[in-house]
């Protein structure tokens, strides 16, 4: 059998467009029959069946090459280092509301992801929205000075999942089962799934100069992101840990944060290559306006505790300008 991949084709000085993929799961092995149009590649490749061993659809070695596996052995669940990492992440989320893994992706992999994002950034949808911190529209049932009436403006561009090439590093990382399993163990989920939404499952938030994301709570309990590119200035991730609770009224504290007077507002330093697991449902957060000509890229990897989860058509339309 001949192994065919976009990387392999590029190394041979050729360009391949993968048009059709059928995958058949056999335990942890996925057999891919790939019909490809191949340009300037040896004729021997044409018409052959390609047999590749994948875990969760992505070659283990290619996924591993993207991360600092010595520092973050997410592929070795029986190792002492893995268990130590799990304990540290759980502690950080409980204590600080965030587990930050700097240098999770290697410098080369991070640069690769930035370049691959550069390739499609012109296709990003410009999302402009005014909302309150609960991601709701204005509700005149509350007084004008109520936190639910205090509008926040968010302005960013969004690259959708279906705009990310299956050969891109970010796509490979997201499809890697070992990463999915690692995050599930950190969060103590018996079952965890990649989001089924063809637009929202994996996205890149793009922030040019002047763009920002206003104060808000996430709808998801936990969000997983990867910093791909940091701006020259601004674009700072700020949050107030555990501001929202299911059993208390947090409006006074929300108002203090909106007035920039809350004593617990923290700026989280996130360098390119950092994987962040963040409890955004309970922690109010924002991204300050970007300054300078370097565009900020942050990928969001969406996982759910139930299969076949899609965003509503309204949410799809807001963030991607279309539905799917």
Regions found by a protein language model. Give the residues of each.
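Short, solvent-exposed beta-strand-terminating loops
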Residues: 124-132
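Catalytic core of non-heme Fe(II) oxygenases with the double-stranded beta-helix
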Residues: 166-171, 180-271, 275
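Interdomain hinge/linker segments and adjacent boundary elements that couple functional modules
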Residues: 137-141
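Short amphipathic
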Residues: 99-104
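Acidic, Ala/Val/Gly-enriched low-complexity intrinsically disordered segments
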Residues: 4-16, 22, 26-27, 36-38, ...
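Catalytic core of Fe(II)/2-oxoglutarate
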Residues: 236-242, 246-324
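Fe(II)/2-oxoglutarate
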Residues: 29-94
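Signature of the catalytic double-stranded beta-helix
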Residues: 105-106, 112, 116-120, 124, ...
């Amino acid at each position: 059998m001949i192994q065919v991949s976009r990387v392999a084709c590029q190394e041979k000085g050729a360009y391949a467009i993968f048009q059709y993929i059928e995958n058949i799961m056999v335990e942890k092995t996925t057999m891919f029959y790939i019909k490809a149009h191949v340009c300037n590649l040896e004729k021997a490749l044409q018409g052959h069946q390609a047999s590749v061993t994948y875990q969760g659809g992505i070659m283990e070695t290619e996924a591993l090459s993207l991360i600092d596996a010595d520092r973050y052995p997410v592929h070795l669940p029986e190792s002492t280092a893995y268990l130590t990492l799990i304990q540290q992440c759980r502690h950080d989320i409980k204590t600080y509301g965030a587990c930050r893994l700097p240098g999770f992706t290697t410098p080369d992999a991070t640069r690769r992801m930035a370049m691959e994002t550069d390739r499609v950034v012109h296709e990003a949808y410009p999302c402009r929205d005014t909302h309150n911190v609960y991601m709701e529209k204005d509700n005149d049932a509350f007084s004008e000075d109520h936190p639910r009436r205090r509008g926040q403006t968010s302005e960013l561009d969004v690259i959708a999942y279906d705009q990310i090439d299956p050969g891109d590093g970010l796509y490979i990382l997201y499809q890697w089962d070992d990463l999915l399993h690692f995050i599930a163990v950190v969060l103590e989920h018996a079952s965890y799934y990649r989001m089924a939404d063809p637009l929202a499952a994996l996205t890149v938030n793009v922030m040019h100069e002047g763009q920002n994301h206003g104060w808000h709570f996430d709808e998801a309990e936990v969000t997983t992101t990867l910093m791909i590119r940091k701006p020259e200035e601004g674009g700072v991730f700020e949050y107030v840990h555990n501001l929202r609770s299911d059993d208390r009224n947090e409006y006074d504290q929300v108002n203090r944060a909106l007035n920039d007077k809350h004593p617990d507002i923290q700026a989280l330093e996130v360098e390119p290559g950092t994987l962040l697991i963040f409890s955004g449902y309970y922690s109010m957060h924002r991204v300050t306006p970007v300054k300078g000509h370097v565009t900020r890229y942050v990928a969001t990897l969406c996982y759910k505790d139930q299969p076949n989860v899609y965003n509503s058509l309204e949410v799809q339309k807001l963030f991607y300008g279309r539905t799917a």
